[in-house]
Amino acid sequence: MTGEELNAILKKEGNYKAFEYKGYKCRILRMGEGMDPEYRLFYLCGYVLLTEKDKYYGKDADTIPYHAHGGLNYSSHRLHNQPEEWWRIGFDCGHACDISLPYQLNSGLSSAVYRTMDYVEDELKQLVDQILADRW
């Protein structure tokens, strides 16, 4: 993937997406907005918003047995500058196997893949399915 190809994808996707799936609110947020373009992180993170009725509401990410890309690594009430007050669990696409920095595009050393907004949305839907399956 070239820098031009990635820039076209980033422009098309935008930096934020909100959707609902099976009654759960989901959020996708791009990291690094407003940073120096040369060093800016541009990977996506995905979050499912939990309510008090959910089994893992208020729990640390490392105690939650659900799987998402790279593992769950976020659980908190607040998310950056987002105003919503929900317990969020989530994951990021900034791992060694992911393209997350501009220099990775031209290094020739990386077999990393850019994880798209569609990919993150699919991962979030699978995460919601795990939450629902764990209710019974």
Regions found by a protein language model. Give the residues of each.
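Charged, compositionally biased non-catalytic regions
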Residues: 1-10
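Amphipathic, interaction-prone secondary-structure segments
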Residues: 10-66
